[in-house]
């Protein structure tokens, strides 16, 4: 038995049998075939190469028989020479076919990975924000990597392995029965003895491998959470480096110990298979040798049978696990399809309308909103923990919200924490659709526009501005990829951040670090504003955008807002008195309702909640 055969048998026997009893819907199989359709020609060629490889593998032992019986035994040197040349030619042909087979299987597998990964990535990006608030990032990345690769194996390792082994076993058995049915039957009697150690060690290796994967996942999770700026800062602030090192060391030592056990189990596995194969070969030599002595078969036939026997046990054992192999691949497909079948909460209309030209008004009309439940927006298998609904899921958080902001007007939202201000902003950016009522820009319901058009017209700066671990220029061009350096500089000047960028050694090419942590809060905010100005939306949303700025930074941002927001409709969650005083209307939000509205002076004169908020939050300003 060759090492390649032993390794293929090992891979098959160590598949996770937890999937054996799973039932996969027929629709899943049909769907897989649809993914395979673009590769049907390549798959056909791949199968032809498998058949060719099997035939060439069987042909070589038959030529051994000829070279012994018809060449060496009778002293025919010419036949020996030409048969040896033929054997060499078959070996070269077998190797060439193996390369061709591998090339085509790689084309199939890598093409499938590309198709699935790009489709899953695009689909996930279209999910609502609620999906990401519930989903464990590591589990989602696993779907994009591990499960997609597992699905790919259905067309490479599993498809090639199952069909290749089936073809090999069939061709080898036909050849062996044709040479000697007695020796062939004796060899098959040993098959159960061959399967027993493989199955036992396979189960043992499965358990150890699952334990190792769990331990590695725990270590990976610890590193992911600690090896970012926020996690590292928390560890340092609480003086926990030694404790963290001890925790990691404990997990690493368990991985070390399990690795040693797996190595020994592997050794026992290969030893058992090799011993059983050697026993089968010994029996074949013993029985076949006596048949040669009796004249029932020739010496060449015996040698050919031994060579064929070496090709039989590995594929035969692997085929005994065909259900595990196939189900493992199908379950991987099913897990990928589970993500693809999750419908986005916000969808584009079949017949979208166009955004009108000119200034855009913003209007909320009788809007009620309830945050979706986990079953509506997420997958329990991606959440990492037992599903628990958030405080607001399934409960109304906005009630009969109605207001209108004229083109170019500034509307300020004020109110206590949890009143519903951020929810109003999320609806305006169409992160969600209202449960009832409508949200309109330019008189058109957002649900009648494509999400691309909404995002092009509505620009948002959140309280915690997110920057990618890239250069300042790349972060700015996220808003407009085709922007020139001149465009970037103008946007930065409008955001009062160019002087700072110009003072940096690398200027616009300065890398901002993970989430922009190399910059101060005020610098991040102003770069985010520059990105907004570069986008040049007609509706601007500032979600507590100046909450982290010092007085000088706020002054500079206010100067930028005064000029950059002219002619644009603005909705601001206000935390600064200067913003409130500039507002054309102020909406006081409490418990999901607009309880007061008017200008700063009007609301102060009217008393009520606004006056209370003003006295407690803004009076010192």
Protein language model features and the residues they cover:
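Membrane-integrated ABC transporters
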Residues: 1-57, 72-86, 101-105, 122, ...
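Cytoplasmic coupling helices
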Residues: 2-4, 103-122, 136, 160-164, ...
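Juxtamembrane helix-loop junctions of ABC transporter transmembrane domains
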Residues: 17-25, 48-49, 56-69, 90-137, ...
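Transmembrane helices of ABC transporter permease
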Residues: 38, 42-55, 157-211, 284-297
